[in-house]
Structure formats: structure tokens, C-alpha cells
Amino acid sequence: MKNLIDFGILNLSSIAPMMVLSLFAVFILVLNFINKNISRTFWTMLAILGLAINIFFLFGYSGIVRGFFDLVLIDGFAFISMIIILLFSILFLPLTLSKENFHDCSLAEFYALYLFMIVGYEFMVSSQNLIVILVGLETSSLALYTLIALHNRTRAIEAAIKYFTMGALSTGFFCFAIVIFYLSSASLDISAISYSAKNTDSILIATACIFLICSIGFKLSLIPFHTWIPDVYEGSSEVMAGYISIVPKIAGFIVAMRVFESLYDSNIAFIQISLYIIAVLTMTLANIMALIQNDVKRMLAFSSISHAGFVLCAVVIGTKSANIGLFLYWLMFSFANLGAFSVLWFTRNKQNIWHERFDHPFEKFNGLVKFLPYTSFLMALFMISLAGIPPFSVFWGKMYLMGSAISSGFIFMAVIMAINSAIAVYYYLRIIVCMFLKEPLENAEATLYKQNSSNAIKFIITFSAILCILAPFMVKFWTDFVLKFI
């Protein structure tokens, strides 16, 4: 009997990276069922191995790869974003090997969910079909909510519930957008929707775009959709808070680039204008809120929101140069933010000994240089990098984006970016002042800052610092690498 399905047409190699990670995740669960006494070091190394093999499969592709009747698309955007997703997913894993044995990091389920979450992000960035993007979005989101809740304290449960609520709203808006797009264009493929928008003056597509902007706004923590995001960061472990600030957002930006940039030439002029306004509001208001925070983790939460506003400017501009700038900016920001959250994790205590609510009040870092000089200097480096002070990492991303804005005629946008960069310097320098110019608290001693230290965390902090310093030498290599694929 003739086969009904031609597996050659499906091109299973197009989902090889997702299949590899799914198999590793299932293997972790089965192995844990057989033996409950396996250490977290083994789980960490196994997860890193799965991610490394995933990267190997990615570099095995040559050119654009399509599969499953064009539902899966591995193009330049997908390839570059998956490299970033996998790279930082690998770099966050050693942070689980902390000195303190936190509940979530010792569970095999944590590592399985971690891999399933990454599978979701890979599907999000490797498709132009809105249903596949939705499946990836939900797969990653449900795993992420659980990972936050596994931290096993009241505020972590609260953070997970708040994030779940925001995610549910995002999914609802996304589903509304999908339904309306299908009604207007009879397709869920982004290119077909774009074609329909260019050839019809449909109020339906405009309405769908409004819902989609709201949905992606929640996922990227853009103002006014950011709502509970600072509370989510505060309640999450430093590992997951740092991860939330980097990996989910690059997946969201790729979806935004695919959808919105394809619609700029249509009859729907308000899309670009709306994103422009949201980008300016996100940069500015998040910066202002960061100025008044009393906790370093919450400050970094608003800082991450502001940086998302900067990167959204690349989507607004919509040129090839701006798209390259997006990848450059996010890579440079990610190294600095990884380092900053790693330092917070390094100095984390299980008990709230510094403040009745916060784990990392600014006062905690008073005089830190006297106890941890090496860590203090590296934290200062990360703050200077995030502030965009030359010649460190984020400076190059900001310069590239500002150059793209000016060359494309977005002069006002470039001015707003420059003003917000100046505002951000204050709250980044604030922690440097605490570490180097203020006297330590009376109960402060070196052992209190080292209770969660480990060689793995020290390695990630040092590695991030080296990359922030070497940023000037990485810019041309990275931009040339990205240019080959987009």
C-alpha cells in the first residue's frame, strides 16, 4: 500500500534542533524516575550537552530550510536568534551550581522544563505561520511559569501567578489577532497576510494588528503592557530573572520583526506610528521608574524594560541596517545583563538579612569593595556597560541603532535614545557609588556575601566581564556574521 505521507516532503531535518532538545528533556524525566539520587551537576551537564548538540545541528544547515509544508522556516532571522537563545541558555545553566542548595535547581524537572521552554522559543522564531508561533509561545510560556514557581517561596508563587495572568492576556490577544487575520486574508502565513494587506483596505487587518501589538507588548514587557513585570523579577530567582530579561525577548522581537516589518508597505500606516510611540514611552518611563527603585533587582527589571524600548526602535525603523543593529544591541546587552544578575546570584542569601522584603537593597552593596574587591569591580564594569559608556558592550549597540535611526530619517528617535542613555547613567552609577564610596552596614561581613558563591558562578561572571571588555573587537565580527544571513 502506498504511503499517505511522504516524509521527504516533510523534511524532518527542519525540526531536528527541537527534536533533540525534546528527547533530552524526556530522557531527563525518565532517568529521574529510575534514579532519584542523581546530582544537579549531572542534570546541568546533561542539559548543556543537549544544547551544544542543538547548536551543532544548526550549523549543519546550508541556506534556507523549509519543512512541514512551509510551516517551519529556518532562515537568517531564525538561525541568528536561535544561536543567541542557545548560547545564553547554556551560559545561564552553570548558575544553578550555586553553593546554597536551592530547591528549584536540585529538581530534575527544572532541567526538563528548561529544555522544553527552549523548544518553544525555537518554534517561535522558526516559522512564519501564526499557529506555529502560538504553539511555540504557549510551550515556552507554560514551562517558564512553572520554572519561576519552583523557586518555592511565597513571592515566587506570586510572581508565577502574575506572569501567568499577563501571559494569558497576551495569548488571548494573539488568538484574537489570528482569527481576524484569517477572516481578512484566508491565511495564517505572514507573507500571505502582508500580501492581502497591500492589496486591500481592510479594517479587519488593522484591528488584528492592534491585538497583535498588545500581545507582543505583554511578551516584551513594553509600556503600558509591563504592569507586573518588576514584581515577577523580584519574586523569581536571580537565575530566572536574568533569563527572562534576555532569552524570551529575543524570540518576541523576531516575531515582531516578521509581522510588523512585512506590513509597513501596506495601507495600515498606524502600525509604525504606534510602535514608535510605544518605543519612546518604554525607553523613557522605564528609565524614570528605575531612578526611584530601592532594590537592585527591581532597578535591573526596569532597566531591561528600557533596553527593550531601545531595541523596539530597530523594529520601527525596519531597515536591514536596523535589523543588524537589533542583533548587535541584544547580544551586547545580554552579556552585561548576564553578568549583573550573576553577581546578584553570587551575593544571594537564603534568608532576608538585609531587608524585610528585598534580597538586594542598595544598602546591601555599601562598601562591598572592602569585602569583595574583584566582584565589586566586575559589577561596576557591568553597570558601566549597561549605561552605554564607551568602549564597553552596550555602547556599540546604541551607536549602531542611533546611526540607523539617523540614516533612515528618524532624527527625533535618535535624540530620545541619547537623552534616555544619559538618564540611565544615574541609576547605574548609583550602585557603583554604594560599592566604592559608602561605608558598609554594621552587620556586614565578607561571609554574608559569599554564602551562595561557587566556581561555576565565578566563571560566568568573569566570562561575561571579558566579553564586555572585548566588545570593540567583537562588533565587526558579529555584524559581518549577521549580514551573511539576513
Curated annotation (Swiss-Prot):
The cellular component terms of Gene Ontology attached to this UniProt record, alphabetical and capped at eight, are: plasma membrane
This enzyme catalyses: a quinone + NADH + 5 H(+)(in) = a quinol + NAD(+) + 4 H(+)(out)
One biological process term in Gene Ontology = ATP synthesis coupled electron transport
InterPro entries under this entry?
Answer: NADH-Q_OxRdtase_suN/2, ND/Mrp_TM
Superkingdom to which the source organism belongs: Bacteria
Asked whether the keyword Protease is assigned, the reply is no
Main site of residence? membrane
- Transmembrane stretches in the record are 14-34, 45-65, 77-97, 105-125, 130-150, 163-183, 203-223, 237-257, 268-288, 299-319, 326-346, 377-397, 409-429, 459-479
Pfam families to which the protein is assigned, alphabetical: Proton_antipo_M
Its subcellular locations are:
Cell inner membrane
Q: Give the similarity note.
A: Belongs to the complex I subunit 2 family.
Q: How does it assemble?
A: NDH-1 is composed of 14 different subunits. Subunits NuoA, H, J, K, L, M, N constitute the membrane sector of the complex.
Could you tell me which HAMAP family the record lists for this protein?
Answer: NDH1_NuoN_1
Q: What is the official name of this protein in its record?
A: NADH-quinone oxidoreductase subunit N
Q: Could you tell me which species this protein originates from?
A: Campylobacter hominis (strain ATCC BAA-381 / DSM 21671 / CCUG 45161 / LMG 19568 / NCTC 13146 / CH001A)
